[in-house]
Amino acid sequence: MTAKFTVLVLNGPNLNMLGKREPTIYGNQGLSEIIADLGLQADQKNIVLKHLQSNAEHELVDAIHNGYQQVDFIIINPAAFTHTSVAIRDALLSVAIPFIEVHLSNVHAREAFRKHSYLSDIATGVICGFGAQGYSFALDAAYTYLNKAQVDK
């Protein structure tokens, strides 16, 4: 069976340390577990899931550019780049791929500097505060969005 959609999941700096880094804020589940669970969910929906975690901004920008006309949707947890990266914002605008911004913690209930996002105003949606389950919510939302877009054509 041919995949119906391709979704790119991007994770920014320090997310490789999930499960070890501040588990009271970010949870005990490691990123590899989160992506494995998401892969099972994607398989059930006939979605090809691609994933990249990088601590380097330019690698995330390159992955976004490489997704042009190759992926149908992006799920991105930009982590600390949320508050600093005009480059990631511009990359997302340049490819015009719909995307959801995901955060494990509720960034609006944390330090003031975490409340500003360079991506939220251009995102299809934002999910925050649900821990690892936020990725699952994002994949469900992406699937619904893409199916509706096909019907609306």
Swiss-Prot record:
Domain of life: Bacteria
Function: Catalyzes a trans-dehydration via an enolate intermediate.
Source species taxonomy: Bacteria, Pseudomonadati, Pseudomonadota, Gammaproteobacteria, Alteromonadales
Residues annotated as catalytic: 26, 103
Listed Gene3D superfamilies: Dehydroquinase, class II
Sequence similarity: Belongs to the type-II 3-dehydroquinase family.
PANTHER family for this protein: CATABOLIC 3-DEHYDROQUINASE (PTHR21272:SF3)
Binding site for substrate: 77, 83, 90, 104-105, 114
InterPro entries per the UniProt record, alphabetical: DHquinase_II, DHquinase_II_CS, DHquinase_II_sf
Pfam families to which the protein is assigned, alphabetical: DHquinase_II (PF01220)
Entry keyword Amino-acid biosynthesis: yes
Pathway the protein takes part in: Metabolic intermediate biosynthesis; chorismate biosynthesis; chorismate from D-erythrose 4-phosphate and phosphoenolpyruvate: step 3/7
Protein name: 3-dehydroquinate dehydratase
Site (Transition state stabilizer): residue numbering on this chain: 21
NCBIfam families: aroQ, PRK05395.1-1, PRK05395.1-2, PRK05395.1-3, PRK05395.1-4
GO MF: 3-dehydroquinate dehydratase activity
Annotated catalysed reactions: 3-dehydroquinate = 3-dehydroshikimate + H2O
Record's subunit section: Homododecamer.
Enzyme class: lyase
EC number of this enzyme: 4.2.1.10
Record organism: Colwellia psychrerythraea (strain 34H / ATCC BAA-681) (Vibrio psychroerythus)
The entry's keywords: Amino-acid biosynthesis, Aromatic amino acid biosynthesis, Lyase
Disulfide feature: none
The keyword Oxidoreductase is assigned to this record: no
Alphabetical GO biological process terms: amino acid biosynthetic process; aromatic amino acid family biosynthetic process; chorismate biosynthetic process; quinate catabolic process
